[in-house]
Structure formats: C-alpha cells, structure tokens
Amino acid sequence: MPAALQDHFFQRDAQVLARDLLGKVIRHKVGELWLAARIIETEAYYCAEKGSHASLGYTEKRKALFLEGGHIYMYYARGGDSLNFSAEGPGNAVLIKSAFPWTDATSDENALAQMQLNNPDASGAIRPPQRLCAGQTLLCKALGLKVPAWDAKRFDPQRLLVEDVGQTPERIIQTTRLGIPSGRDEHLMYRFVDAGYARFCTRNPLRRGQVEGRDYLFLDQGN
C-alpha cells in the first residue's frame, strides 16, 4: 500500500506547498490498478489576489477552497476536469498544472497502459507517455479523476493519495501563471516547474524568447 502524505503537509502557504509538491506522486486506484503521475508543474492561488476563484467569493461550488489544507477542489476547465489542493488560509490553493507518468512496483506498466487508454489523442491514437499528463485536464483524464467523485473531499489512502517517493527537483523554475486574464494579477510569479521536466509541462517556460530574470527565475533547492 502506498504511503500517503498526511493532511498537515498541505496546511502551508500556497507558494511553499506548490514548490514542495513538485516531485511528489499522485496515485489513484482504478479497479486493481494504481494509476500514477509525478507532479512537474503547479500554480499557487490566494484569496487576496484577482487570479483566484476564491477572490470571486464563497459559493457552495468553491467551498473546498475555504476548508483547511488538504481538501480537494475540482472544477471544469475547457470541458475537462482540473485538480487542486487547498492550502493554509481560507481561499488559498494549489492547482496541479501538469505531471509525468510514474511507474514503479506499485504502479506498473499495466497502470501506464490504462492511463493511455483513458486519454487518447484527438484522433483516438495512443498518446506517448511524455504528453499524457502535459496539462491540467490531460492529467485528470489520464488518472481517471472526475469532479463529481472528488470535489470537496479529503484524500482516501485506499483510493486517492499523494506520496513522497524521494524525488526532489534539482532546480525549480518560477514564472507567471497561464491563462490569467489581463488585469487579474497575471504578472504574479506563482507558477512553479520542475526544471528537469520543463519541456513536458503545459508550456515550456524555457522556450525561445523567454529571458531569465524577466520572464522566469531559477530557484535552487533551499531557496
């Protein structure tokens, strides 16, 4: 049985949590298989800034954002499911932006094959592993995570958990979040990417034309 992170792990500042989730593995049990993906990209959100759902106020749909750290907040984005974890402070959370398929003794090649069946490309063909979870809705589809099943719930170590498997990014890229409308605090550098997996995330922050110090920063471990 995988060893789940405890709820208190999530009861931290959203930016701290967003960085510390990089390298952790999400596992979702579907049938007899533990589908798994290593988190490579996260975004922090605060109630006090305009880019967050919580800044629009409390509603029943958004209640998970206002619960203590370690609650699951899921919503629909562009027709797909998105996964967030509440952090310390009402309205603060971390969006799991992208991940990379993870295989080990618990989550084997059969689990990866099931993830590929869950998330074919637009033509119905099998996606290569490196593109399988390269976006917030893609990772939920690959892992079989659905809004009705998990929104406002706690983790269940028998079915859904986050595990520390000993993988720590050597460097983290800090940059601006994606898809934030103009005038909604789009300038805030609340997006964090495992530098070793930058080319597999939603949008590579190291792509041509991006300038270090202007568009992104490198954070070494301990920063």
Swiss-Prot record:
EC identifiers of the protein: 3.2.2.-
Q: Which Gene3D superfamilies match?
A: Methylpurine-DNA glycosylase (MPG)
The entry's keywords: DNA damage, DNA repair, Hydrolase
For whether the record's keyword set contains Zinc, the answer is no
List the Gene Ontology MF annotations in alphabetical order.
alkylbase DNA N-glycosylase activity; DNA binding
Q: Top-level EC class, please?
A: hydrolase
Q: Which Pfam families match?
A: Pur_DNA_glyco
- Superkingdom of this entry's organism? Bacteria
Keyword DNA repair annotated: yes
GO terms of biological process kind: base-excision repair
Family of the protein in this entry: Belongs to the DNA glycosylase MPG family.
What is this protein's record name? Answer: Putative 3-methyladenine DNA glycosylase
Q: Which organism is it from?
A: Pseudomonas syringae pv. tomato (strain ATCC BAA-871 / DC3000)
Question: What is this organism's lineage?
Answer: Bacteria, Pseudomonadati, Pseudomonadota, Gammaproteobacteria, Pseudomonadales
